[in-house]
Amino acid sequence: MLDRLNALQLAVGDTNVRGPGMTISLTDGPADDEDAQVVDEDLRIIVNGLWQSGAEAVSINGHRITARTAIHDAGSAITVDYRSVSSPYTIEAIGDSHAMTGAFASTPASSWLAYLRDNHQIRYTTNISSTLQLEGDPEGSADQLQRRP
């Protein structure tokens, strides 16, 4: 029963998670070039690539991502669950870092990052970490589960 509770807390993002993982940081290109700005779709593609690669928990600039998380443009800003985030965008994913890195390299998300770099001057770095800590967010996605009409 406790294992099931822990799995559910991980899935809804309301518990802290610690473990090995991978970090991808994106930085907007030149401010005077509209096409050189990271947009919501870029973040969604990368997050989906990380889930596809075996991530167990993901965050963007400290905001936990779950299946119910909204990542949207709001004018010139990007919001994660209606909270503004800005460049540089730090996407952290906890999971088997070596397996995840190899799997991510073969996803469309990896190709998309290369496209952004080569065609839109958006810079990115990837790092493997032996320990990452993603904070739980009881006020975020998990809380939405209780607000059904």
Q: Language-model segments: which ranges?
A:
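Core subunits and conserved enzymes of cellular information-processing
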Residues: 1-149
